[in-house]
Amino acid sequence: MRRTASRTAGALLASALLVPLMAGCGGEAGAGDDGTVTVTVGYQSRTINTVTAGTLLRSLGYFEDELRARGERDGVTYEVKWQDYATGAPITAQMTAGKIDIGSMGDFPLLINAARGKQLNRPTKLVSVTGYNLRGGLNTVVTAPDSPLGSLKDLQGKKVSTSVGSAADGTLVRALQQAGLDPEKDIRKLNQQPAVGASALQAGSADALSQFVAWPGLLAFQGRAKALYDGAELNLPTFHGVTVVEDFAKDRPAVLEDFLRAQGRATEYLHEHPVAASESVAKATGLPAEVVHLYNGAQGIATFDTTVKPALVAALKKDVPVLRSAKLVGDVDVDAFVDEQYVKRVHGSAYAKARAAGPPAARGGEVWLKGEDSTSAFATSAEVLRYAAGHKDRLRAAYVPDAGTGTLWFADRAVWVSDGPELRPYVTGSAARADVAAHPGARIVPYATALDLARPS
């Protein structure tokens, strides 16, 4: 059954506005009867490329440290309340209801956040970025491990689960359009929370699932799904960022800067201690540390940087027509929504250089052995295989970048192409088949065969 876009938009807005309010919420950093100023932060613990503004930041206590120091200077007691959600929509609902001051969410939800804030006279601002991927690799379409579906074109007439209005939904819409399919007419889109969609995929009530981090990696790691489409094939940036209620930013700019300073410290911690950060997030979320590291590790899919890069703003502008065509937003003034002044002040004179910096240079993968608090990095995927083959009994996880898009993936879940002396990994079977078609003599081989071929002769 086709759901009309207007009905979808209405349902989304209604559900967002009717989210039950949590008891004891703060909002707008109001002072309580005892003079305590409460700052309420909304985050998504399992959307792990927001960890520097959520899960990891909370566990490190950096924001509380900054506010404690501020309180000692100005004689005010500050309290932080953290509220955890599965997606960005309820965070937006709570922000527009005056119950959350600062939130983090993906690019498409950020635009809805901007639109709803303006519509409900509680405008918001995008003030920093958490994690990004310049090609779009943070979103993936997956199918069941034994699914006969081999490409996006095979989704015609099929049931596809996603969270409407999310970054993953945006990836699905664009990918289907590139494949020559109408996202509204040619598939049956199921608007579901990520966990519900994962269950639907496993139960067979959904043929495919389009979701954001960490769901695709988690399901692949658990052997419950295989990748059908790598979002990086779109070659369009995707990111998550921090949004703040404008009145809060104006009333308490120093507190907002304390948050951004704390976010910067959490980002530095993640860069300097990637394995420890992955373990910390895993403990807080219940996700396997190996999955967290796939996205957040030294060579992970996400790059963590608080600066608001021009490429990300440009991508956000390209997202507006997609949401507008689905009647989820009207016009959104992205330039007015983006407000870099606070993060600029936190960075000081170093901001311009940091903003201009790109992601780290691509490498060949890494291996995590049991009992180790660091990983081993390699120049090529073949070296990863060779090392993994020699440490089978101690192997915790091996990661390799897709030969075409660079998206990091689990070596034992990748699709391997053997071409003479070369071994090339791919996230999806369709990409591997395209490689074989372009290289006479190349063939797809199982992971075990790839391991054997990588061994020194």
Feature-to-residue mapping (PLM):
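Conserved C-terminal helix/tail region of periplasmic/extracytoplasmic solute-binding proteins
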Residues: R324-P360
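A bilobed periplasmic-binding-protein/Venus flytrap-type ligand-binding module shared by bacterial periplasmic
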Residues: L138-P148, T238-A254, V417-D419
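Pocket-lining segment of extracytoplasmic ligand-binding domains
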Residues: K189, A195-K283, A382, G390-A398, ...
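C-terminal motif of bacterial Sec signal peptides marking the signal peptidase cleavage site
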Residues: P20-G24
